[in-house]
Amino acid sequence: MMNELFGEFLGTLILILLGNGVVAGVVLPKTKSNSSGWIVITMGWGIAVAVAVFVSGKLSPAHLNPAVTIGVALKGGLPWASVLPYILAQFAGAMLGQILVWLQFKPHYEAEENAGNILATFSTGPAIKDTVSNLISEILGTFVLVLTIFALGLYDFQAGIGTFAVGTLIVGIGLSLGGTTGYALNPARDLGPRIMHSILPIPNKGDGDWSYAWIPVVGPVIGAALAVLVFSLF
């Protein structure tokens, strides 16, 4: 169990370091990649997921996402006694990963005066605030993610091919469905860094938009549960 928890911790740390790292590079001022756009962000997140799964996959199932962990447990693939430890490890990894992003980009955070840009490097936020629409966006994106992960398990791939497929899937979801909310798809990916946003001493950071914070937590869990329901028909 300890190896599995370390794998979930380390994989989620790398996921956030690389994923929110690319967001910081695009959004924060005076970086070499400043203003390179949404396509760069989606590509970066796809690579982040693939690298994180490669690194952690020999230690744990590489869920790196509480919604995936809950979905696997609902499907009968993980004992419920393991769910909370997995999720705690994922949150710990996400929070430490975000600290490393902050350390990497510290001078650029200090040069940023826009609170919204700072928050965007920590957590997701909607392009247009609409509770129902935003929730549906997170449900749909996570439904596609988890259903496809389950479906990939039906095929025999050479080692590593499935991981590349998941990375490509993240890019696809981001390009197709992610532009409305920033596509969290993962409670740890959003809430863990959002907590760190409240803690870290960053000038001009503003608040953490906590009125929105429940959507990237609840939406992915609902999406994962729906994916389990649909996959049961396969």
UniProtKB/Swiss-Prot annotation:
PROSITE patterns: MIP (PS00221). Keywords: Cell membrane, Membrane, Repeat, Transmembrane, Transmembrane helix, Transport. It catalyses: glycerol(in) = glycerol(out). Gene3D superfamilies: Glycerol uptake facilitator protein. GO terms for molecular function: glycerol channel activity. SUPFAM superfamilies: Aquaporin-like (SSF81338). InterPro entries: Aquaporin-like, MIP, MIP/Aquaporin, MIP_CS. GO terms for cellular component: plasma membrane. A motif (NPA 2) lies at residues 186-188. Its main location: membrane. A motif (NPA 1) lies at residues 65-67. GO terms for biological process: glycerol transmembrane transport. It comes from the Bacteria. It is found in: Cell membrane. The chain crosses the membrane at residues 9-29, 37-57, 61-81, 83-103, 135-155, 159-179, 214-234. It is a multi-pass membrane protein. Aquaporins contain two tandem repeats each containing three membrane-spanning domains and a pore-forming loop with the signature motif Asn-Pro-Ala (NPA). NCBIfam families: MIP. Mediates glycerol diffusion across the cytoplasmic membrane via a pore-type mechanism. PANTHER family: AQUAPORIN OR AQUAGLYCEROPORIN RELATED (PTHR43829), AQUAPORIN-9 (PTHR43829:SF9). Belongs to the MIP/aquaporin (TC 1.A.8) family. This is Glycerol uptake facilitator protein.
